[in-house]
Amino acid sequence: MNSTSDDNPRPALRALTPLEARVLGVLFEKQHTVPDTYPLSLNSLAAGCNQKTSRSPVMNVSESEILDAINTLKRLSLVLEGSSSRVPRYEHNIERVLGLPRQSAALLTALLLRGPQTAAELRLATSRLHSFADTSSVEAFLEELAGNDPPRVVKLPRTPGERESRWMHLLCGEPSAEQLRGAALSDEPLPPGELEGLRAQQRELSERVERLEALVVHLAGELGVSLDDLKGRL
């Protein structure tokens, strides 16, 4: 497995705030999903932080709050400000500071933006950041992140009803005692922001399925075959 990290432990960063983690995640995400607009302006960064889809929890933060987070991340060398534009633009420095290869940074980004995820969920969530061959490949990079000094992720105990364990990033500090004990999340109501984030993800997946179904119908028409014929070949 290729890695940009070395054998020496990285200096420990102080725990990030949720907003600082969101800013860092948005910068890495947008670098790979909308490269033409990267580095990001403050306005674009605010839109990414307050995005309703692919975010858990959903946030509603001001540009001044984001700017405070940026200034802190700049002092930690995690964010850099460009000087070649009249409008200030910002880029992440996560791979260099944390000593991570792109694959690991992509997984960490998904955890920063979406909260705890299973390896299978992470493979889907990172599809536009890095294409993992299979879930086993995702798990291998997660295990590497967990073995870093200091560790960057942790594998949470499975909660009742869960088939797979979820992974959580550690950039905002250690998980709570309840998470480590595997307390059943279903016993407590979800916070409004997290519930809205899950609903937004569900809508996003439904829209993606609809687009794929429409594409299949179009391709079937181009090939001159019926959908029943295609189903019979699967």
Curated annotation (Swiss-Prot):
Q: Which InterPro entries match?
A: DUF480, WH-like_DNA-bd_sf, WH_DNA-bd_sf
This protein's superkingdom? Bacteria
Which family is this sequence assigned to? Belongs to the UPF0502 family.
What's the protein here called? UPF0502 protein Bphy_5360
At the highest ranks, the source species' classification is:
Bacteria, Pseudomonadati, Pseudomonadota, Betaproteobacteria, Burkholderiales
